[in-house]
Amino acid sequence: MSDIQQDSTSTTLGGTSLGGTSLGGTSLGGTSLGGTSLGGTSLGGTSLGGSTTTSTTTPKSTNSKNKKKKQTSSNNNNNNNNNNNNNNENNRDNDAGSSNKSFMPLNNNEDEGTKDYKQGGYHPVRRNDVYGNRYQVVDKLGWGHFSTVWLCNDKDTPITTSSSSSSTTTTTTSSSSNGNGNGNGGNVIGYKQVALKIVRSARTYSETAEDEIKILNAISKYNAQDKCVARLLDHFTHRGPNGRHYCMVFELLGNNLLDLIKHHRYRGMPITLVKTLMKQTLIALDYIHTKCKIIHTDLKPENVLLEKSFDFFTSNDYIWSEKYGYFKNRTSSSNKQSQQQQQPQQQQSQQNINDYSDDSDDSHSDYSDSEDELKNKGNKKSSNRDRDNNKNKNIKKDDNKSSVNEINNISKENTDNKDLNSSEENKKEEEQQQNKKEEPTTTTTTATATATTTTTTGTEEFKFVNGISYKFKKNNELFNENHYPRAQLVDLGNACWTDKHFTDDIQTRQYRAPEAIVKAKWGTPVDIWSAACMAFELATGDHLFKPKSGKGFEKSDDHLALMIELLGKPPRFIFAGGDESRVYFTHKGDLRKIPDLSDQWPLFSVLTEKYKFSIQEAKDFEAFLLPMLNYLPEKRATAKDCLNHTWLKDVPPFLN
């Protein structure tokens, strides 16, 4: 595989996801839009693991405004015609009133810019362009360093009304070879929508895309439909003016788990919900580890998506009930307008996985202290600083009321470091989320900057088009027939094989395993470590490990210090067995740059003292997490071990 990492689409904006990235309530990398499931059926005769085909549709000139009327009549007679000339402009369907508007970007911070629309770069896309003879462009979803992503209608999968009934119920059918694509004879009222990722055409990007497709095909090969893993629907190549581009088609999903964390105002979810989501995540990990022989390498809340779209930006409008799942809280409707005004219009953040730079390797769900505070920190153990600050947080843990818990006694240090961009939030919201906010440093790159400065060891940040979210249906329910939300693991762009690693720079900072930090031998257990970190975050709203750099030490030093404080001194495998162990440890196993680690704060104490878990809750949760946090990868619990743990015994069996 090329040194360039594949698209990491984990940036959240509004709730729609692109292979793990959220925007406006719809998602790429999973299964459903508005509750319509694609299931495991092969679409339009295209096998999920089928061979690559080539489309040679050439995009139109941007000066084609006057051709629209002429094309409309012609194209309506040629929809999905197998004899279409791929080089003809008429290989697209123009609905009445549609626009052939160019999506070429401007040179500003709101899009990817025009400089990389050249040989080896992005492919120019226009509304109503058709790719692979079936995917018609509707709108732009987002972009990153490696690719652009587009919302498309799948013209081979129309949604029809029954011709024998006046019922308004719609059915999704694979089209026959007739021109209208309505094989059942009903009236076509729409088309299944998918997300199309078009990769830049340079060889390095193409090689990375080939690796990703192989991994995604392996997942689809073993019938992943019930394994809580998102699947690739289709892939092909397209030749345009800038070269040959790999194109990947994904299903549409809902919000990611980071949105759910935000919905609960970073105070933790009901433990029953945490168990449900973790069981599905572990089902997915067990499947890819044991059956597919794949390591995800970037498990985090942003990369687990719900199957239904959900509007989390009016947080108090929806509350959790074990009996009913999420339902509309009618008593809060009078406060809806004020709540919306208090929420930021867009909680845009940045994703920097696999980047070992201290300024940019954080998950975008992480918010650290301001740059000024970091400059004032001395060479002392940051975990003690975190403890002093966070003990004042005094979160009351209640299984059924965690979405309305109050946070008291925020320390003055925390309130002095408010995000400068939080003017739209009220003071209480700022205090509640202070430990999650980060003022970007001057070295943090935007998506536009990444497109020009990211090296071959970087990964992709996605930015999203404003105003897309209104197009997607918002469901008022987030549960299935058993009242529990369904979720899927997404974003295999950084995955690798168990016997073939593409890079050792893996995992987002907060979820990174110790063996990955010291560059020791690693495998599937790195995903289990990340799963433990994610479970803690879902239950508490905070990261289990939130390292910071300071005077005389880097984030990796602090990260290891936090692990030692929680789990004790690491074994020789960690302090001496990695290629970079000596960078962080002495020959005796002490940290070089943070030697004073006399205090311990074990997990049970963290749960009871800081998050106010009951004694029994803390014991049970600790018993589940600690085997997943074993320093030694070979002794760490497997996904199957975790699924068999008593902590998950009360999760509904339908998830199996």
Curated annotation (Swiss-Prot):
Residues 135-648 form the Protein kinase domain. Residues 96-108 have a biased composition (Polar residues). Pfam families: Pkinase. The active site is at 298 (proton acceptor). It catalyses: L-seryl-[protein] + ATP = O-phospho-L-seryl-[protein] + ADP + H(+); L-threonyl-[protein] + ATP = O-phospho-L-threonyl-[protein] + ADP + H(+). ATP binds at residues 141-149, 197. Residues 16-48 have a biased composition (Gly residues). SUPFAM superfamilies: Protein kinase-like (PK-like) (SSF56112). The keyword Mitochondrion does not apply. One of its GO terms (molecular function) is ATP binding. It comes from the Eukaryota. GO terms for biological process: regulation of mRNA processing; spliceosomal complex assembly. Residues 1-127, 157-185, 330-454 are annotated as: Disordered. This is Probable serine/threonine-protein kinase sky1. It comes from Dictyostelium discoideum.
